[in-house]
UniProtKB/Swiss-Prot annotation:
PANTHER family: ENDONUCLEASE 8 (PTHR42697:SF1)
Gene that encodes it: nei
Protein name stated in the entry: Endonuclease 8
Positions bound to DNA: 70, 125, 169
Physiological role: Involved in base excision repair of DNA damaged by oxidation or by mutagenic agents. Acts as a DNA glycosylase that recognizes and removes damaged bases. Has a preference for oxidized pyrimidines, such as thymine glycol, 5,6-dihydrouracil and 5,6-dihydrothymine. Has AP (apurinic/apyrimidinic) lyase activity and introduces nicks in the DNA strand. Cleaves the DNA backbone by beta-delta elimination to generate a single-strand break at the site of the removed base with both 3'- and 5'-phosphates.
Native species: Salmonella typhi
Length: 263
């Protein structure tokens, strides 16, 4: 499943296709969204924001399209006039003079006003996005030490979108390897140096993955252009200490680590 870097890269591709261009045609599959087709025609997409695995498509008239891909949703970009070859079910089509963006198979789609955006249940639950350039290590450290999160094992915490949005399994194992910790640790048990290292890694590793394009390789391994240190490398030698990378299951997800240098 794609994580924050892949979601942000997808948003970048959508923005590159239609941002700042008048919408010449708008179509929604769901009846409750049909009234917005005429309201959005002629408007501009001003930006596309990511909040974890949700996309917020902001329009020049103040409305925002909320969409969450869940397991099966996918966005596509095509040239205007092109007929896509797919068996997926179309949910959203936003068209400009030269490009069209299409959302297939997703079911969690809403149109929100500015006021509704501030009170949306998912957006209220989700934590700050690790790819938000405004988020600092100091703020991450404060969240780690907050009463809500300080007693949580990292094995589960680093998958919890209410802690930090955009984290997922490959980021979890790479972050913990980077700071030399296992998934059983809790923030309340770390010393100052460990807390500082983890606070930085929680931002640095996702941002590194994003800047290395956060894409999938030909085998659809998400994040494959980001060079993994331990993820999917069980049985290989750890590049830091030479120990053998192991694999187990933590919080119902595959977990990779070096038992020799992660303590």
């Amino acid at each position: 499943m794609p994580e924050g870097p892949e979601i942000r890269r997808a948003a970048d591709n959508l923005e590159a296709a239609i941002k700042g261009k008048p919408l010449t045609d708008v179509w929604f599959a769901f009846a409750q969204l049909k009234p917005y087709e005429s309201q959005l025609t002629g408007q501009l997409v001003t930006r596309i924001e990511t909040r974890g695995k949700a996309l917020l498509t902001h329009f020049s008239n103040g409305l925002t399209l909320y969409s969450h891909n869940q397991l099966y949703g996918v966005w596509r970009v095509i040239d205007t006039g092109e007929i896509p070859q797919t068996t997926r079910i179309l949910r959203v089509r936003l068209q400009t003079a030269d490009k069209i963006i299409l959302l297939y198979s997703a079911s969690d789609i809403e149109m929100l006003t500015a006021e509704q955006l501030m009170t949306h249940p998912f957006l209220q639950r989700v934590g700050p996005d690790v790819l938000d350039a405004r988020l600092t290590p100091e703020e991450v450290k404060a969240r780690l030490l907050s009463p809500r999160f300080r007693n949580r094992q990292f094995s589960g915490l680093l998958l919890d979108q209410s802690f930090l949005a955009g984290l997922g399994n490959y980021l979890r194992v790479e972050i913990l390897w980077q700071v030399g910790l296992t998934g059983q640790h809790k923030a309340k048990d770390l010393n100052e140096a460990q807390l500082n290292a983890l606070s930085h890694a929680l931002l640095d590793i996702p941002r590194l993955s994003y800047t290395t394009r956060g894409q999938a390789d030909e085998n659809k391994h998400h994040g494959a252009l980001f060079r993994f240190k331990v993820f999917h490398r069980d049985g290989e030698a750890c590049e830091r200490c030479g120990g053998i990378i192991e694999k187990t299951t933590l919080s119902s997800r595959p977990f990779y680590w070096c038992a020799h240098c992660q303590k």
